[in-house]
Amino acid sequence: MAGEGRVVRVNGPLVVADGMRNAQMFEVVEVGELRLVGEITRIEGDRAYIQVYEATDGIKPGEKAYRTGSLLSVELGPGLMGGIFDGLQRPLDRIAESVKSPFVTRGVKVPALERNKKWHVIPVAKKGDKVSPGDIIAKVNETDLIEHRIIVPPNVHGTLKEISPEGDYTVEDVIARVDMEGDVKELKLYQRWPVRIPRPFKEKLEPTEPLLTGTRVVDTIFPIAKGGTAAIPGPFGSGKTVTLQSLAKWSEAKVVIYVGCGERGNEMTDELRQFPKLKDPWTGKPLLQRTILVANTSNMPVAARESSIYVGVTMAEYFRDQGYDVLLVADSTSRWAEALRELGGRMEEMPAEEGFPSYLPSRLAEYYERAGRVIALGKPERFGSVSIASAVSPPGGDFTEPVTSNTLRFVRVFWPLDVSLAQARHYPAINWIQGFSAYVDLVASWWHKNVDPTWFEMRSVLVKILLREDELRQIVRLVGPESLSDKDKLILEASKLIRDAFLKQNAFDDIDAFSSPQKQAKIMRLIYDFYTNASQLLDKGLTLKKILEKVGSFEPDIVRVKYTVKNDELNKIDELDNKLKEAFDSLLKEVA
């Protein structure tokens, strides 16, 4: 132990202790007889202010505060996949077994990784090899989907003095020894890393490949790149959680980390019930084999909301360093900000806007800055990414409040949820007028190369139609649609088609829940062909009424495509497109 002090004051999750000379910021302290875990957030002389991550009921002045000399850290190694942890990375399933209670007992200590479970280790490095931070020295097939790569920790480099042969080992077994110029360092299957310190990498890259999610409005209208950042703000009942769950279920990421930060417990229960039954659309294996859940629900200690966000992003960086694309989903960062506000108030800090601490923007920036696509440290060379999608819950749907407005400064994709769309049963309720994505130009080349060379052009036409429809809506409200020209009436017709056939998506329909990029492009092609051909006929003097008499019957078929055509039956969409073109061609001949 690094020393101990005495508690002099208890104020909710904030404990003040004297006699803490030589303590460091963010050092872990165990408070009271129950040894409740806390973290030092302020030091004044030999007095430390400790943010305790468990309920402090019964802690009284005079009790001891034990310094540990270490920062709040997580265990990184085989056994994380498919696990459900609390905000301190304690495994909730094993805690339930040990305490025989539905609630987490205060002061309980259970390691994140199971100590007795044996893993089949295949070494890939040899004795005498020169190793440096990030080098892969062994592999473990953790699940059918994830090959866990054992990497040299960032602070270790030297000559591999010894490495264990292929066989079964626990995470505590020493599998290698590295000679660091006379100092021999033992390596186990797991390593520890402080959650507040970003893990190092070789080089940060520009994100150019889209993170495909199977949600059409996300992939096509407001795409996120691998290594990108996105925010989903929305008022109560607008569909934030279902949208985030859809991302977690269907996204192309190899590893998904879902952090439930201060949200309702039944939402995490939902995840645990659904994920084992669902199959990953990219591999056909159970989704839980690539998912890690961090549950810090609304009835758990407020202070641990902050640690749950950091625990999630540190685990994401670890899998990024192995060469995987990771998606971190956080629901919701507003609850974390509320925890910062409460603790700031208890520490008597000067409040800023709406009572939030003045350092809220810098904390949000630190968090989002840990996203990115990188070249990982070590050999062999590999690319990994951490993409972050976070919900924001502004009170009353006010996007000008501090958490939303500050988040907007740091994210490059904005998916605002509109309660009026949700009430109209339009899901996902992402407002296509307010939303934006800074990755459209970066990912366009991927779409052109792999899906459709006219993707950017078609998307631009769809977006222009939606923007023009928003302008026309005001005129229609005042004087009715009859006063509009045929060109503008066609805009209204096409925008209705875009909304019903493309933007709306049923997250609970077996076929519509996930749209492959090829299916998305083909549905977009149908709408694009409908609009551009009708527009040409209007230019040649035909009336919209005459055009719709001939081709209007195709509209219900275009809308039904998303429900009736599976991702491997796309030739049916081509057949419909050919029939549509034939109908337009016959109209063109009549005009001629």
UniProtKB/Swiss-Prot annotation:
Localization per record? Cell membrane
Q: What is its main location?
A: membrane
Q: Which GO terms describe its molecular function?
A: ATP binding; ATP hydrolysis activity; proton-transporting ATP synthase activity, rotational mechanism; proton-transporting ATPase activity, rotational mechanism
For the protein in the UniProt heading, the enzyme class is: translocase
Tell me the superkingdom of the source: Archaea
Which EC numbers does the record give?
7.1.2.2
Keywords annotated in UniProt: ATP synthesis, ATP-binding, Cell membrane, Hydrogen ion transport, Ion transport, Membrane, Nucleotide-binding, Translocase, Transport
Q: Where does ATP bind?
A: 234-241
Gene3D superfamilies per record: 2.40.30.20, 2.40.50.100, Bovine Mitochondrial F1-atpase, Atp Synthase Beta Chain, Chain D, domain 3, P-loop containing nucleotide triphosphate hydrolases
Topology versus the membrane, per the UniProt entry?
Peripheral membrane protein
Q: Name one GO biological process term.
A: proton motive force-driven plasma membrane ATP synthesis
Catalysed reaction, written as an equation: ATP + H2O + 4 H(+)(in) = ADP + phosphate + 5 H(+)(out)
* GO cellular component terms attached to this protein's record: plasma membrane; proton-transporting two-sector ATPase complex, catalytic domain
Give the family, as the similarity comment puts it: Belongs to the ATPase alpha/beta chains family.
What is the purpose of this protein?
Produces ATP from ADP in the presence of a proton gradient across the membrane. The archaeal alpha chain is a catalytic subunit. Component of the A-type ATP synthase that produces ATP from ADP in the presence of a proton gradient across the membrane. The A chain is the catalytic subunit.
Tell me the PANTHER family matching this sequence.
Answer: H(+)-TRANSPORTING TWO-SECTOR ATPASE (PTHR43607:SF1), V-TYPE PROTON ATPASE CATALYTIC SUBUNIT A (PTHR43607)
Q: Assembly state and interactors? A: Has multiple subunits with at least A(3), B(3), C, D, E, F, H, I and proteolipid K(x).
> Which NCBIfam families does this one have?
ATP_syn_A_arch, PRK04192.1
Q: What is this protein called?
A: A-type ATP synthase subunit A
Q: Which organism is it from?
A: Sulfolobus acidocaldarius (strain ATCC 33909 / DSM 639 / JCM 8929 / NBRC 15157 / NCIMB 11770)
> Which gene is transcribed and translated to give this protein?
atpA
